[in-house]
């Protein structure tokens, strides 16, 4: 029985030795990085492709070409190397072209499904599975029965559930707009939440603002953490210099010294409170930067608190969206009553256009 050449130790040793030699000679004898990459890529592909080759003649031919490639590299015959690689390139191009043609041919056979058809199929599948679990339908149902008999029943059941939810929402009364917030760092970004502006209807500017504040808050936190690390090193330097001058080791409560109070005057915040000159020289510059960062953060908090007051003012966004929500509710209630009186009593399952899904779509539900 033919044995794989990869399992013969002498063959494996020879191929690996030659491969290492060629890899070492490529950068030595070829000065084009692009051509070096091309040779290595082609060589790697061919070795992987013929790894399990059992044909002695094929292996013999490939080893001769491998050895010839190494000799051409040593002699600087780059054109001959290109000639050796040409048949491999042609084969690759033909294979790629065949793949593209096959994919284009298969594209013509694929039927693109309408999203509405996909939705109807899911409704039908869920309906059949539910009824089969209850033992109300057999395991096998012909396609004709599924589409002509069960599909209208499934869509009607789905529409009935939808109608019930609409009725419950209208029964609960008009929805009201309210204030909500998202927290980014110290900031509470307030915005109006209502049925009018939920989901995709939400303001794009609000999304941009929230992302910007999130990024700025994180940057501020990172800067403060960096300053705290530098302040610790600065305090060590101050203690060392003070010791060199006075032979005394000073003690400073660094967290308390760097503590920022938001409700005292700025002049008090930034004045150095240490009695040691070296601490003032080393730690105070970092401390002042930290105070500026804290001050900037609290300014943003004040800005968003004032923004909340604007939203709550008479005639502001909250009142506007609350009014629009009530108008939308009144309009939907009128349409629902009209639909209940004029159309719902005459719904027919198996007549397209007069079934319940079509009626709900007609009235915007």
Curated annotation (Swiss-Prot):
Keywords: Glycoprotein, Mitochondrion. The keyword Ribosomal protein does not apply. N-glycosylated. Glycosylation is important for correct localization of the protein. One of its GO terms (cellular component) is mitochondrion. Its main location: mitochondrion. It comes from the Eukaryota. Essential for respiratory growth and required for mitochondrial protein synthesis. Required for vacuolar acidification. Belongs to the RRG1 family. This is Required for respiratory growth protein 1, mitochondrial. It comes from Saccharomyces cerevisiae (strain Lalvin EC1118 / Prise de mousse). The gene is RRG1.
């Amino acid at each position: 029985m033919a044995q794989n050449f990869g399992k013969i130790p002498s063959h494996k040793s020879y191929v690996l030795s030659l491969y290492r030699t060629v890899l070492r000679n490529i950068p030595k004898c070829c000065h084009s990085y692009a051509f070096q990459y091309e040779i290595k890529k082609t060589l790697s592909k061919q070795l992987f492709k013929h790894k399990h080759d059992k044909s002695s003649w094929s292996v013999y031919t490939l080893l001769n070409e491998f050895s010839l490639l190494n000799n051409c590299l040593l002699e600087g015959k780059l054109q001959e190397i290109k000639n050796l690689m040409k048949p491999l390139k042609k084969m690759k191009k033909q294979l790629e072209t065949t793949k593209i043609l096959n994919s284009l041919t298969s594209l013509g056979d694929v039927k693109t499904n309408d999203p509405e058809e996909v939705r109807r199929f899911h409704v039908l599948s869920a309906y059949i599975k539910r009824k089969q679990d209850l033992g109300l339908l057999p395991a096998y149902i012909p396609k004709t029965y599924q589409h002509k008999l069960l599909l209208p029943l499934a869509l009607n059941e789905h529409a009935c559930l939808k109608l019930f939810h609409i009725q419950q929402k209208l029964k609960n009364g008009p929805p009201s707009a309210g204030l909500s917030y998202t927290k980014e760092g110290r900031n509470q970004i307030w915005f109006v939440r209502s049925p009018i502006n939920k989901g995709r209807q939400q303001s794009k500017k609000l999304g941009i603002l929230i992302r910007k504040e999130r990024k700025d808050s994180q940057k501020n936190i990172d800067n403060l953490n960096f300053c705290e690390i530098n302040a610790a090193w600065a305090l060590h330097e101050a203690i060392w210099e003070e010791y060199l001058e006075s032979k005394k080791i000073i003690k400073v409560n660094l967290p308390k010294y760097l503590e920022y109070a938001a409700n005292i005057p700025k002049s008090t915040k930034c004045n150095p409170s240490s009695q040691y000159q070296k601490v003032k020289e080393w730690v105070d510059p970092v401390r002042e930067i930290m105070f500026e960062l804290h001050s900037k953060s609290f300014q943003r908090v004040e800005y968003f608190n004032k923004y909340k007051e604007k939203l709550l003012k008479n005639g502001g966004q909250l009142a506007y969206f609350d009014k629009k929500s009530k108008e939308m509710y009144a309009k939907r209630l009128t349409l629902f009553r009209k639909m209940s009186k004029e159309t719902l009593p005459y719904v027919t399952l198996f007549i397209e256009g007069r079934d319940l899904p079509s009626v709900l779509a007609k009235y915007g539900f």
